[in-house]
């Protein structure tokens, strides 16, 4: 929720509580409720007027049957926190809007939507995801990928390597992708090849957008583009088929892309927020880890400082 609206919304919540009115929304997103509140003994939760939490789980290319998997996580968290927790599935734009409109309290978000959630809803990241194929534990690389037989070679400096791309065709993931557009374009600007994202055609002969990691990489495999830019973890299934891995190679990499994380709205009281964070961290335990891995192939959640974690994205956006 936006800070300036707290007073008005607080009064509205009071009125709605007295009148017994319940507002439901987010109709474009599937909803499931995991209710284990009968195990909760802490009356202070009710005193703070927090009767349930809503978590948005954005759909991703490597997530299948996400609603059921999210339901299982919500059920686990509900037991740990002691109040009903709703699992909602939708895209990241809908997740940010739900936080802004006070229809959600928590969301799994990548770094750029996390910044948007901070701007619109005063939400902050408290946890980041760790994957086995992240180079920096909770940061990863943006990679320029070329055909294995390409004449383009990695040089002794980023500038020398990227200079070879002049006049070539490039396929970005999408204009909103951090590793597949924002970070690589920022690098091109820093190296002096283009002034901004609107002048990419002055350096490349053709600029394409794959729409997702798989399609961008497929363009490389099929010889339809000279280079594509994706996340390093996209070089593994399900994004890139195992039989195609030896058909491509990394030309250049940019480190420090912030891993996806978990944003919590500022309206969630500190005591509830900490209970939720501690419950989420219990997903790291061996007996619970499969619940976490099933969502997005993450192996661990770690605490992060919101500003420090997202600073690389802030800096990259300045150049783009």
Give residue spans per PLM region:
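Short, glycine-/small- and polar/acidic-enriched structural segments
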Residues: 43-153
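Ligand-binding cleft/hinge of the Venus flytrap
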Residues: 72-81, 179-209, 239-243, 316-319
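A conserved helix-loop-strand patch within extracytoplasmic ligand-binding domains
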Residues: 130-181, 186-187, 191
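Short helix-initiation/N-cap motifs at beta->coil->alpha
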Residues: 87-100, 112, 195-218, 256
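Periplasmic-binding protein-like
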Residues: 50, 54, 58-60, 126-143, ...
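Second-shell loop/turn segments in exported
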Residues: 60-67, 169-177, 206-207, 221, ...
């Amino acid at each position: 929720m936006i800070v300036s609206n707290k007073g008005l919304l607080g009064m509205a919540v009071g009125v709605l509580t007295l009148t017994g009115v319940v507002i439901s929304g987010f109709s474009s997103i599937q909803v499931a409720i995991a209710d284990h509140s009968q195990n909760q003994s802490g009356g202070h939760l009710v005193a703070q007027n927090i009767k349930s939490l809503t978590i948005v789980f954005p759909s991703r290319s490597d997530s299948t049957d996400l609603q059921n998997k999210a339901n299982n996580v919500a059920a686990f968290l509900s037991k740990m926190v002691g109040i009903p927790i709703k699992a909602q599935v939708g895209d990241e734009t809908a997740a940010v809007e739900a936080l802004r409109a006070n229809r959600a309290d928590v969301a799994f978000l990548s770094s750029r939507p996390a910044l948007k959630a901070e701007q619109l809803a005063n939400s902050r990241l408290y946890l980041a995801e760790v994957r086995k194929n992240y180079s920096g534990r909770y940061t990863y690389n943006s990679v320029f990928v070329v055909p294995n037989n390409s004449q383009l070679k990695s040089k002794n400096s980023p500038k020398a390597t990227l200079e070879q791309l002049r006049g070539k065709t490039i396929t970005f993931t999408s204009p909103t992708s951090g590793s597949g557009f924002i970070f690589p374009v920022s690098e091109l600007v820093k190296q002096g090849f283009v002034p901004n994202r609107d002048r990419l055609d002055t350096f490349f002969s053709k600029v394409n957008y794959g729409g997702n990691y798989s399609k961008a990489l497929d363009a490389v495999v099929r010889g339809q583009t000279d280079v594509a830019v994706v996340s390093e973890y996209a070089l593994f299934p399900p994004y890139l088929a195992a039989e195609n891995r030896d058909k491509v190679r990394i030309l250049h990499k940019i480190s420090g892309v912030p891993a996806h994380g978990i944003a919590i709205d500022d309206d969630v009281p500190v005591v509830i927020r900490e209970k939720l964070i501690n419950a989420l961290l219990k997903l790291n335990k061996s007996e619970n880890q499969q619940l976490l891995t099933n969502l997005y192939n993450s192996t661990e959640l770690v605490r992060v400082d919101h500003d420090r974690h997202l600073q690389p994205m802030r800096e990259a956006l300045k150049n783009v």
